[in-house]
C-alpha cells in the first residue's frame, strides 16, 4: 500500500523521464535516480534498470526496402514496349508503348472496323520480356473487344475526332473551304471546359438508340466524304481523343448528383449579369458545334434532341428540382444586360410596377389623389381633426414629409450652433458639437431611407401616418389617466403633443408649441442635445428596447434649467424604425 501524498507533495512531484523495469510492471511512480526509491525501499536496488522501449516500426528501416522493391517493377512495366504475334494486330499496336496501347481502346469509329476482326477472333500473344505486364494488357484488350464496348466507343461523334486531329499537329495550313471550317484546337478545349455541365447532361440524357440513329444517319448521307476526310486526318495525326464520352455512371447517386448540379448551373438565372456568372455558351457562339461543319448539315439535330428533352422533362417531374436565383418563369428576367439594372429596380420599386396596372376605384374611404398633401400641417390642426379612431378613417389623411422635417432640423441645428455673435474659440467649440450631431444623424438616417425606399407612394406613406395617428390616440388616453407631464414627438424630434402639466413646468402653453414646427431640442442645452442623439442612435438601429429611463435637463421659457427624471417609450412602425416617442417627465426638486 503506497503512502498517501499530501497536496504539497503532489505539486512538487515530477514524473521520471524513463521508468525502471519494476516500476513499469507495477505501474508505480518512478524517480529519475538509479536505483529509484521504490527499488531501494524493496531491497532490489541492484536490479533497478531502465525499461527498454519498443522501437517504432518506421524507424527500423524495414519499410524502405519493401517499398523500393515494389516500386522497381512498376517503373519497368511502364517502359516495356508491347509486341504481338499476330500480323494484323502487330501492324497497329506493336510499335506503341503501353500508354499508347491503353489509349487504343478509345480510338475513333473509323479505326475500329480495321482492327475489329483481329481483336475478336485472334488472341493476343505478348512479348515475354515482361509476362506480368503482357497478361494485364491482354486481359484489358480482351475485356474491351466485345460488341457492347464498340457501341459505347461509337458514341463519340466522328466529326469531333477528325476535326481535332486535323487541327492538332498539322503544320501545312491550306486555305481550302474544308480547313477554314475547322475550329482552333485551343478554342475547342476552352469551350469544352466551360460547357462541362452541357457535356454531363448530354452524357446522362442521351440514350444508346439516339446515338446509333445519329451515326447511321451520318454514315448513310456522308459515307464517302467522311471516310476520305477522316482517313487523311488519321494519317496526319494519329492521336486519339475521347472528349465526349456519354455513357452513364454506374452509380445512381452520382447520376442524381450531376443532375442536380446541372439544374443549378443551367436553369438558374443570375441576380445581376456579369462575365463571371453568365453562361459560357453565350460568349462562345462560334465554337465547335454540329452546324459548323458542312458534311453533317443534312442531319436534323432538332428532331434528334426531342427524345432528350422528353427524358429531361420526365426527370424534372420525378425528382426535386434545384434552382438558384430566378428561374425562367420568374417575373425578373435578366436576359438583356443593358436592361438588367432597370428590371431589378422595377421589381423592388412598387411605384413602377403598379403604374402599369389599372388602379381602379381604389379605397372608397380614402381618396389618395386628393389626400396626398405635401404642404406642412401643424400638429395643432391634426390633433383637433383626429379626435377618435373613426375620424382617422373618415377624414382626410394628411401625409407627413420626413425629408422636409430633416431639412428643417438641419437648418435649426445650424442656427443653434452657428455662434455668429461669439468669439472664435467658442465658435470652434460650437462647430465641433454640430459636426458630432450631424455625424450621429448620418449614421442612422440611411437605414431609414433604405427601409422606405421600396414603399408604394403615397399609399404606404399614408398608411404609416394613419398608424402614427392611431397610436397617438391611445397614448393620449394613457397620459390623461396618469396625469404625468408628458411630451410626444416624432423620430425627427418634432413635438406633436404636449400635456398642460408639462407646459406649466416649462412656462409654455400647448398652443405655442403645437401651432408650428417645434423641435424638442429647442428645450435642451447643447450637452443634452448631443447626449440625446447618442441615445437615439443606439435605439434607432441596434437596440430594440421599448422603454428607457434617463435624467435630462430642459430649458424653460425664462432660460433656467429644470432637471427631470424621464422615461422614454419608443413606438416602432412595421419596419422596426422608431415612429413615435413618448416622454414622461417628473421634475427633481
Curated annotation (Swiss-Prot):
Task: Tell where it localizes.
Answer: Nucleus
So which residues are the signal peptide here? none
What the entry lists under Pfam families is as follows: PAS_13, Zn_clus
Name which cysteines form disulfide bonds. none
Q: Where is the composition biased (Polar residues)?
A: 80-90
What GO MF annotations does this protein's record show? DNA-binding transcription factor activity, RNA polymerase II-specific; RNA polymerase II transcription regulatory region sequence-specific DNA binding; zinc ion binding
Q: Where is this region: Disordered?
A: 59-90, 218-240, 340-362
Which Gene3D superfamilies does the UniProt entry name for this protein?
Zn(2)-C6 fungal-type DNA-binding domain (4.10.240.10)
Compositional bias (Basic and acidic residues) spans?
A: 347-357
Domain annotation PAS: ranges: 471-542
Quote the CDD domains the UniProt record gives: GAL4, PAS
Q: Name one GO cellular component term.
A: nucleus
Extract the DNA-binding region annotation as residue ranges: 20-48
Listed under GO biological process in this entry are: cellular response to starvation
Instruction: For this UniProt record, give its keywords in alphabetical order, as a comma-separated list.
Output: DNA-binding, Metal-binding, Nucleus, Transcription, Transcription regulation, Zinc
What does the record give as the function of this protein?
Transcription factor which regulates nonfermentable carbon utilization.
- State the family named in the UniProt similarity comment for this chain: Belongs to the ERT1/acuK family.
Q: Spell out the protein name for this chain.
A: Glucose starvation modulator protein 1
Q: What species is given as this protein's source?
A: Candida tropicalis (strain ATCC MYA-3404 / T1)
Amino acid at each position: 500500500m503506497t503512502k498517501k501524498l499530501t497536496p504539497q507533495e503532489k505539486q512538487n512531484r515530477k514524473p521520471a523521464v524513463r521508468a525502471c523495469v519494476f516500476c513499469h510492471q507495477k505501474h508505480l511512480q518512478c524517480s529519475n535516480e538509479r536505483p529509484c526509491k521504490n527499488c531501494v525501499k524493496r531491497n532490489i536496488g541492484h536490479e533497478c534498470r531502465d525499461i527498454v522501449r519498443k522501437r517504432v516500426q518506421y524507424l527500423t528501416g524495414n519499410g524502405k526496402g519493401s517499398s523500393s522493391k515494389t516500386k522497381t517493377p512498376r517503373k519497368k512495366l511502364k517502359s516495356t514496349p508491347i509486341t504481338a504475334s499476330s500480323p494484323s494486330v502487330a501492324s497497329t499496336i506493336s510499335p506503341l508503348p503501353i500508354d499508347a496501347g491503353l489509349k487504343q481502346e478509345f480510338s475513333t469509329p473509323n479505326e475500329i472496323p480495321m482492327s475489329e476482326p483481329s481483336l475478336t477472333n485472334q488472341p493476343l500473344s505478348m512479348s515475354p520480356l515482361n509476362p506480368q505486364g503482357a497478361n494485364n494488357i491482354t486481359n484489358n484488350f480482351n475485356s474491351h473487344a466485345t460488341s457492347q464496348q464498340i457501341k459505347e466507343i461509337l458514341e463519340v461523334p466522328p466529326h469531333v475526332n477528325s476535326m481535332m486531329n486535323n487541327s492538332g499537329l498539322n503544320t501545312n495550313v491550306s486555305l481550302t473551304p474544308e480547313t477554314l471550317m475547322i475550329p482552333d484546337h485551343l478554342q475547342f478545349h476552352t469551350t469544352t471546359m466551360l460547357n462541362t455541365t452541357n457535356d454531363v447532361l448530354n452524357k446522362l440524357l442521351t440514350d444508346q438508340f439516339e446515338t446509333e440513329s445519329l451515326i447511321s444517319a451520318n454514315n448513310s448521307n456522308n459515307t464517302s466524304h467522311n471516310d476520305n476526310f477522316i482517313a487523311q486526318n488519321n494519317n496526319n495525326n494519329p492521336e486519339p481523343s475521347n472528349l465526349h464520352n456519354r455513357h452513364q455512371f454506374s452509380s445512381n447517386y452520382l447520376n442524381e448528383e450531376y443532375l442536380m448540379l446541372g439544374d443549378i448551373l443551367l436553369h438558374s438565372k443570375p441576380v445581376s449579369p456579369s462575365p463571371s456568372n453568365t453562361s459560357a455558351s453565350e460568349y462562345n457562339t462560334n465554337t465547335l458545334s454540329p452546324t459548323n461543319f458542312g458534311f453533317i448539315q443534312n442531319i436534323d439535330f432538332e428532331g434528334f434532341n426531342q427524345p432528350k428533352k422528353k427524358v429531361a422533362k420526365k426527370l424534372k417531374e420525378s425528382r426535386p428540382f434545384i434552382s438558384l436565383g430566378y428561374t425562367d418563369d420568374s417575373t425578373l428576367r435578366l436576359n438583356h444586360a443593358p436592361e438588367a439594372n432597370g428590371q431589378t429596380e422595377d421589381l423592388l420599386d412598387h411605384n413602377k410596377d403598379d403604374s402599369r396596372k389599372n388602379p381602379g376605384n381604389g379605397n372608397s374611404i380614402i381618396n389618395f389623389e386628393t389626400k396626398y398633401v405635401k404642404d406642412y400641417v401643424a400638429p395643432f390642426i391634426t390633433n383637433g381633426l383626429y379626435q377618435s379612431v373613426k375620424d382617422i378613417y373618415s377624414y382626410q389623411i394628411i401625409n407627413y414629409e420626413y425629408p422636409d422635417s430633416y431639412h428643417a432640423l438641419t437648418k435649426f441645428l445650424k442656427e443653434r450652433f452657428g455662434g455668429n455673435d461669439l468669439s472664435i474659440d467658442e465658435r470652434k467649440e460650437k462647430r465641433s458639437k454640430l459636426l458630432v450631431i450631424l455625424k450621429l444623424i448620418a449614421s442612422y438616417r440611411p437605414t431609414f431611407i433604405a427601409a422606405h425606399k421600396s414603399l408604394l407612394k403615397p399609399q404606404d406613406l399614408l398608411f404609416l401616418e394613419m398608424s402614427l395617428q392611431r397610436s397617438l390616440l391611445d397614448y393620449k388616453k394613457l397620459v390623461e389617466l396618469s396625469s404625468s407631464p408628458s411630451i410626444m414627438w416624432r423620430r425627427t424630434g418634432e413635438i406633436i403633443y404636449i400635456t398642460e402639466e408639462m407646459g406649466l413646468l416649462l412656462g409654455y402653453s400647448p398652443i405655442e408649441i403645437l401651432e408650428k414646427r417645434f423641435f424638442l431640442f429647442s428645450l435642451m442645452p447643447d450637452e443634452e442635445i448631443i447626449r440625446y442623439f447618442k441615445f437615439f442612435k443606439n435605439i434607432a438601429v441596434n437596440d430594440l428596447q421599448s422603454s428607457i429611463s434617463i435624467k435630462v435637463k430642459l430649458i424653460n421659457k425664462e432660460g433656467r434649467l429644470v432637471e427631470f427624471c424621464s422615461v422614454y417609450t419608443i413606438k416602432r412602425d412595421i419596419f422596426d424604425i422608431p415612429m413615435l416617442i413618448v416622454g414622461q417627465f417628473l421634475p427633481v426638486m
